[in-house]
Amino acid sequence: MPEGLFFFAKFSILKTYCLLQGTILHPKTIVRYAVELTSYAIFDMDGTLLCSTGMWDHVTDRILAKYGKTITHEQRMANMTLTVEGTAAMFVQQLGVPLTEPECAELIRAEARYGYAQEATVKPGVEQVLAAMHARGVRMCVASGTETPLIEAALTSHGLMRWFEFAVDCKNPDGKKKPDVYLDALHRFGVQNPVQATVFEDSPVGIATARAAGFATVGIYDEPMAEFWPQITQTADFASRTWQDWLQNVQQTGPVPPQISMKL
């Protein structure tokens, strides 16, 4: 399929075209067409590919318990989108962990390596989705708030890294509150315009950021983030409770109608 086709594979464009042509399609069907037409897929890791959001809670709890510190629910939620350095800064500055920030960051990395190897699991259906997208020629990468060496180690240990061309991490402590990591991933593909890519996320912050930057977005349910599911379903272009459901929905849609493909 020509590269130019993917440039216009976006919900708003498909919807507008269908309205102009008098074609009646359910919004979710239009979104599935947009996802079918994407040529680049950018995946979050924690809570999206791996059941590891809860693992990070364990990392936090083990470190804080060691120093007799506690964390509020609000602080825990805010921590979800931070980098290792951002988390270390929170632990030291806000929670009073008696370490320097670099020392705390190294402790977090050590605990995370253990957690990914011993506690994290692959979310059901992920392998099938990656295989299906690979078969369609979709180029894939991972963009995470977790550092690249940890991403690669975690995905390699679970047999997933082979599907991805590369992994990128957030370079600013605010993590996915800014679109830098998604744009970095896009540019690594050699692409400039976000409408050519779809971002898969479990975080409402990540989804909102990616969507505002122009990416198509798919929200994936993750139990530790359940309280944010209503927000995710309202913000993401498409949302699915399981990877199996998402894949089934796309497969059931069938081929994109020729008149839409040709117009795009």
Regions found by a protein language model. Name each.
Residues T70, R139, A216:
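Residue-level detector of anion-binding/catalytic polar loops
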Residues H26, Y33-Q128, H134-R136, P149-E152:
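N-terminal helical cap/lid subdomain that shapes the substrate entry/recognition surface
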Residues G4, Y17, P27-S39, A131, ...:
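Asp-based, Mg2+/Mn2+-dependent phosphohydrolase catalytic module
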Residues L49, M140, V199:
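Conserved SAM-binding loop
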